[in-house]
């Protein structure tokens, strides 16, 4: 029997960025932090310039002749790159329809679990199909099922809005929720903002009584 192949369990070696002393080219074309061209200078001179400005020398184009480096704050640059990558990943997210199923006689604990599931789906940018399943004669209680779905929509209103109102679909009742694009401003918050605005409006000055000149004799 041939021996089983051995798998390397060691963590993969992370490729370190080509910055500062890791740059091994003797001549470099250097761009300053503000975009100004410093021309072709030696590696040592480029490192001295970066150190004097308390910045990093970063290799940005290794295939150029000579290689191109830029003087910058590498920590800030890396943070911005990671931020852009996250935003691009978020924009490329394909919206899916996730389903949350329940019975119209659901207890509070199970209802809270379904709410938590829906919140996670909505946070990920997915739509939620809320389904109430009927069995046998339970189909007679569509009004209770609709009440349950509208309660769920109310409990999720800060994160979602109704895309399709509750309706019958075969032996089920369904409702579609979609992630809310703009934050919900509740009625109480609107009233508080309006009251605050009224309080900040200065009161008009009170009219003063005109003085009547006394006749001179």
UniProtKB/Swiss-Prot annotation:
Name the NCBIfam families for this protein.
infC
Q: What does this protein do?
A: IF-3 binds to the 30S ribosomal subunit and shifts the equilibrium between 70S ribosomes and their 50S and 30S subunits in favor of the free subunits, thus enhancing the availability of 30S subunits on which protein synthesis initiation begins.
Q: Which Pfam families match?
A: IF3_C (PF00707), IF3_N (PF05198)
**Self-association state and partner proteins as the record states:** Monomer.
- Family annotation (Gene3D superfamilies): Translation initiation factor 3 (IF-3), C-terminal domain, Translation initiation factor 3 (IF-3), N-terminal domain
PROSITE patterns reported for this sequence: IF3 (PS00938)
Localization per Swiss-Prot or TrEMBL: Cytoplasm
Q: Which GO terms describe its molecular function?
A: ribosome binding; translation initiation factor activity
Q: What is this protein called?
A: Translation initiation factor IF-3
Under the heading InterPro entries, the entry gives: T_IF-3_C_sf (IPR036788), T_IF-3_N_sf (IPR036787), Translation_initiation_fac3_CS (IPR019813), Translation_initiation_fac_3 (IPR001288), Translation_initiation_fac_3_C (IPR019815), Translation_initiation_fac_3_N (IPR019814)
Listed under GO biological process in this entry are:
ribosome disassembly
Q: Which residues form a coiled coil?
A: none
Q: Which UniProt keywords apply?
A: Cytoplasm, Initiation factor, Protein biosynthesis
Which cellular component appears as one GO term in the record?
A: cytosol
Family statement drawn from the similarity comment of this UniProt entry: Belongs to the IF-3 family.
Residues covered by region (Disordered): 178-217
Source organism's superkingdom?
Bacteria
